[in-house]
Amino acid sequence: MAKIQIKSEKLTPFGGIFSIMEQFDSTLSSVIDSTLGLRCSSFGYQYSEIVRSLMSIYFCGGSCIEDVTTHLMNHLSLHPTLRTCSSDTILRAIKELTQGNISYTSDTGKNYDFNTADTLNTLLLNCMFASGQLKEGEMYDVDFDHQFIETEKYDAKPTYKKFLGYRPGVAVIDDLIVGIENSDGNTNVRFHQKDTLKRFFERFEQNGLTINRFRADCVMSTTLPPQSFTVLPLRTARPLRCSMSAGLHGISR
């Protein structure tokens, strides 16, 4: 005869997320709070708890931030020690971490907004080192390009791709994003690209990221003269090589 046991524990179809939440907490929570600072001294949620809650939404199949309140809270709150915050708290924290835009004026008098997101870009690198995805002392190849992101937000501008959106510059190592700097969708890709790259490479150097080669699309050859590559870090394990992709007229050092 089969034995039937009555269990009093609560069951959840999302229990698999708990081990990921615990790994996140042990690996990244201290890095997040030390980089962003403490959000509260007593009651309330720290930034690490908010980022973990945001991560859990998408790991559990959610499609928007509000899903944590409407669908997931009853399940995620079953964890005995790790707290999950509401969608309102997540949205407030995102607004708190927003950095103001930098406005540049072109020769024709038009203004274009850039958002450097310095603190969040620093956090991105810190988390990659803490999680072992990047390692100090290793040499890395950095690729840079611009992306066009379609959006219907109030500040979206018309792009040359015939839709409204943003035009972030993105730096990657293999498949890891190591820097993002947003700008208006109607900004020419050449416009103040040198300043974007300077900020990226200064941040890489400050965080101990050793660059072997740098690659970018062909617009670099007409945007930056060779002397502009002094923005690249020189304190590397061996002489820095700036390797440009085809069509860059052999700019190297």
Predicted feature residues:
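An internal, acidic/charged active-site-proximal segment
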Residues: 179-253
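Basic side chains
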Residues: 52, 167, 213-215
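Dynamic "connector" segments at or just before major functional cores
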Residues: 1-163, 170-188, 193-207
